Amino acid sequence: MTRGKNSFTPGTPLPDHWFHILLALADDKRHGLGILQEVTEQTGGHIQVWPGMLYLALKRMTDEGLVSETEAPADFVTGGGRPRFYRITPLGVRACKAEADRHARLVNAARAKRILRKDP
């Protein structure tokens, strides 16, 4: 999916781990470990993004304009190093919404085919 800097078009299907990373950043900026923990929590442990995969994705997502590095919160205390914090960009929000809408259409299609019930 590497097309070049800021060439991402919302509506283009995202890799699953990109979608989960954007969801993790949708409500707050986070550092790498915080993103990993949020993805694990929001998926009930069914999706795990490994550190190498995360940082490669963050690099590519930054190049595409979906996320950007940002300052650590003022109250953030480190145990030594200086973790990088990331936030979702307006383009990232649009891409995340488009992907969520795409997933919703797939769920609706599965319900129409009686693969899924309407009530969870």
Task: Walk through the language-model features, giving the residues of each.
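A detector for short, charged/polar N-terminal pre-domain segments
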Residues: M1-P15
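A short, glycine- and basic residue-enriched loop/turn
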Residues: G32-L33, H46, T70-A74, P83-F85
